[in-house]
Structures are given as C-alpha cells and as structure tokens.
C-alpha cells in the first residue's frame, strides 16, 4: 500500500476497507502437540473456546482434533507435513489423495480456512526442499479446486530469518539464496490466489538478542514516549512488532508485490525458560499477549505504519507448555495453559477485556536483567530413565575427557547412580561445548541450576555467564 501515497485519503480508506472487508481481525491460538501429558482433543477445544479464540492452527491434520472442531465457529488451519512436500510437488495424484483424506471428510463441518504447506521450510538447511515448496503449494491449490473447495487459502509459514535485512524496516530484504528462486514465485502465487504471506514473528527473540539497543517496554507495547523513526521511510514506530512486520512488507514491495497481505502465523512471549534466557517470565508473557491482542482486535484496524488500517489476522503461540519440544527452555514455555488445563494467566482473545480488567495480579518479573554467575546443567525431574541413559552415552561420546571423572574409581563415580552420572556428564559437556553450540537441553531431559551440585572431591564443571 506504500505505493498509493498519491491516492486521495477517501480513496485510500475505501481501498483498505474493501481489501479488509472479508478478513476477520479475530485472534487465534496455535495448538501444538509435542507433549506426553496434554489434555485430549475434545478437552483442548473446550479450553480454546474458553479463551474466546476464533482461530486455531494445528501442525498436521490430526483427525481426532478435526472431529472435535466439528460444528464450532472456530476457523481452522491445517498443515501438510514437511516430509511430504517433495513427493507432493512432483505428483498431482498424491496431492489429490492428501486433500481427499485430510480435508474432504471434515469440510465444511469443520471450518478449515487455511491449508499450510510445511512449516518454516526456508529455515531448514536442506535447501533441496526449498525449491519444491511453491510447486507443492500449486498442486495443493489445484487439488482443492478438483474437489470444488473454494474457501480454503493455501500458504506456508516462514520464520523471520527469511529476511536478510530487517533494520531499519524500510531496508527489509529477503535472503539472496531464496529471494529470486523461491520467494518471488511464492508471492506471485499468493497474489494470484489472494492468499497471505504467513510469518512467524517473535519480538521476544529480537529483544533478547539485542537488549542493549531495544527497550523492553518497546517490545511489550508499553513504550509510552519511546519511539523509533525509520530514516528511509520517515515512518514512526511505537513497538517492535510493527517494525518486524513492516520489514516483511517492505521486502515484498521490493520484489514487486506491495499488496500481498500478511498473516501472523505465530507470535508470543515465553512464560519461563532457562536461567540464561532473560525476560522469559509470566509477567512479560501476559503483558505482551494481552497488549498484542488488544492491538490486533481494535476496530477500525490499526495496521502498521507502512500499512495503516490493514487487518492483520494472527495466531498466538501457544495453547500449552509442551514438555517434549526440543531446544532451550523457552521452547517448552510459550503456553497459556499448563498441561493439566490450568491457566498460567488470564487472557481474553476477544480483546474486549481492558488491560485494567484482569483482576489476578501477575508475579513480578525477576529475570529482566541477564543472569551473572555460574550455572550447572542437571538431569530434570520426572524424566524417562532409558532416555537419560541414551543422553548420557551421547554426552560421553563427544570426547574431550567429558566423562573421565565418572569412571570407576574416579572422584565422581560415587554415588553409582544413572542420574548422578548423567548430571555430571551434562554439566561437563555443556561447559566444554557451549562456545561451539552445545546446549543444556538433551531433548528436554536437562535443566539449569545456579546451585552447585559438587560433592566432596567431585567438582562439577560450570558455565559462567
């Protein structure tokens, strides 16, 4: 819409009104399933309703979840698994069969509105799949047409790292390795089919990676008088999310597609994390989600500085804290509910509750400043014994005398316990390999502690922050 600067104000307003008329500003929830202790699909749908969420995105086409969503007014996004993209891109019959199996039995009783082909494919280092993505999207769209299904938009969610440059927003540029061969034909497809550019956008990570230059309140929509003016566009920003979204908008404009609409496929703020993950707490999580929902559901739509008045369909991440998600602790702590169905904090997806209307006070944040000191990596509570044994073997197989101290007769052999030995191995591995990318995760089996577990002559290696 930036190219319409010469259009009279009333005409611009009319164009925005027409382009947004059929797009709902209702906010949804991402329903991930990477947990071994999550409620049933039917219970989960009731929790989604309790949030007043009007959209839900799942990361597959789980039949039990889809059946539980039958006859609700919740708009549903389903997903083609990453591993099927290559085959679907080369076979219309396989695409037709996927739609026949995963869409036709449920539509229209389930309000499937978006069919997403893969998840963050362009972040995957396997670049071979990149070039199959748009062909697979075209085939899925053709399959929907074959089955006379017209109301489902086809797209694919991308991470913000599809951008090579994002600051200032007016300098937004797609990565050179994907811009021409993948993004441009994708935008052509999205423009032609009136679909969306789906983007996963997390101000938390942008802030956490650059705390020295980004004010926390600016990331949480609490900036007050804190603003940023883009020298290239002269647009003024009051929050970090708008900056990130406009970087995408400018990148699309740079490729000749200024009017492809943006859909926030994921955004959110972690309610907890590892000791070294600053700002991941309930207070910040609730503040961000409440504020972003209020912004996105405001009528008339606020949009962004580069796209004022544009509706931005959005889905918050995520429904649950998922205990089997790999990676650092924040990955397992984006939920609005604990796995037992208890709310972590109150949030109203309708946007009707004023920010002062949430009665239960939030716990004061204690980690908005980086932790300074030593940290050890230990086996987490209530984890699978077999999995711990496998992780111990992995840590010890990396060399560098990682596990010498827990060999028979050595200073850390006693007590002769799997969990003791694994905790030593985890700490030793992390201390040695953190600088080269090693983490204290071990597929969710490990946790960080500031308490020194050393005992007697056994000294556990530590990481110093």
Predicted segments — roles?
Residues 27-31, 54-58, 74-80, 113-117, ...:
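Hydrophobic faces of well-ordered beta-strands that scaffold small-molecule active sites
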Residues 24-39, 88-89, 173-177, 376-385:
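Active-site mouth loops of central-metabolism enzymes
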């Amino acid at each position: 819409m930036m190219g319409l600067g010469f259009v009279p104000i009333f005409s611009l307003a009319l164009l925005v009104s027409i382009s947004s008329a059929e797009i709902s500003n209702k906010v949804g929830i991402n329903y991930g399933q990477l947990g071994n202790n999550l409620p049933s699909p039917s219970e989960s749908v009731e929790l989604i309703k309790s949030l007043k969420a009007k959209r839900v995105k799942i990361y597959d086409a789980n039949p039990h979840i889809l059946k539980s969503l039958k006859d609700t007014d919740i708009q549903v996004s389903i997903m083609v698994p990453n591993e099927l993209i290559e085959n679907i891109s080369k076979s219309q019959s396989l695409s037709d069969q996927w739609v026949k199996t995963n869409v036709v039995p449920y539509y229209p009783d389930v309000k499937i509105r978006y069919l997403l082909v893969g998840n963050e494919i362009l972040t995957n280092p396997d670049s071979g799949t990149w070039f199959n993505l748009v062909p697979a999207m075209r085939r899925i769209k053709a399959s929907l047409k074959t089955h006379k299904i017209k109301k489902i938009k086809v797209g694919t969610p991308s991470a913000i790292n599809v951008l090579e440059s994002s600051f200032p927003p007016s300098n937004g540029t797609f990565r050179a390795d994907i811009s021409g061969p993948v993004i441009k034909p994708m935008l052509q497809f999205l423009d032609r089919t009136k679909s969306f550019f789906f983007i996963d956008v997390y101000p938390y990570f942008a802030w956490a990676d650059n705390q020295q230059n980004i004010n926390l309140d600016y990331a949480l929509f609490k900036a007050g008088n804190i603003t940023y003016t883009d020298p290239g566009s002269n647009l003024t920003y009051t929050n970090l999310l708008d900056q990130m979204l406009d970087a995408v908008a400018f990148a699309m404009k740079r490729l000749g597609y200024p009017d492809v609409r943006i859909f926030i496929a994921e955004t959110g703020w972690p309610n907890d994390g590892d000791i070294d993950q600053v700002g991941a707490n309930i207070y910040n999580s609730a503040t961000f989600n409440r504020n972003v929902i209020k912004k996105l559901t405001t009528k008339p739509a606020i949009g962004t500085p580069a796209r004022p008045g544009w509706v931005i369909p959005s889905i918050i991440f995520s429904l649950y804290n998922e205990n089997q998600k790999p990676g650092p602790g924040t990955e397992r702590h984006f939920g609005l509910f604990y796995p037992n169905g208890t709310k972590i904090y109150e949030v109203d997806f309708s946007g009707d509750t004023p920010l002062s209307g949430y009665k239960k006070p939030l716990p004061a944040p204690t980690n908005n400043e980086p932790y300074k000191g030593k940290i050890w990596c230990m086996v987490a509570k209530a984890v699978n014994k077999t999995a711990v044994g496998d992780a111990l073997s992995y840590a010890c197989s990396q060399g560098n005398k990682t596990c010498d101290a827990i060999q028979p007769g050595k200073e850390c052999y006693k007590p002769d316990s799997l969990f003791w030995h694994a905790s030593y191995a985890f700490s030793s591995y992390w201390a040695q390999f953190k600088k080269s990318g090693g983490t204290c995760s071990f597929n969710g089996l490990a946790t960080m502690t500031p308490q020194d577990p050393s005992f007697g002559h056994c000294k556990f290696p530590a990481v110093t922050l």
